[in-house]
C-alpha cells in the first residue's frame, strides 16, 4: 500500500515530533509487515538504524516498527517481545 500526499503522511522517529514526508510504502503479509520507500523532498530518506518509527496519516497511526537498516522498517510484532518494550507498552 502506497501512502502518498493525499493521505497527509508524517513520520515520527522515537519520541520526536512527527514530520511530513512525500510518501512511503507499507507491505503486509502473514509473517511480517514492512515500511519502505520513504521519500522526503523527492529523495529517499535514511533512517537511524534501531529507531522506533511511526507512520501517521492525519491523526491515525498506520504503522509502528523498528528501523532494521537505513531504508527498511520491520513491524514491532516481528522485532520485539513484551520484555523488550519500555514502560507500559504491550504487544
Map each language-model feature to its residues:
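Short beta-strand and beta-hairpin "edge-sheet" elements
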Residues: 54-89
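Juxtamembrane "anchor/assembly" segments of surface/extracellular structural proteins
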Residues: 1-49, 75-91
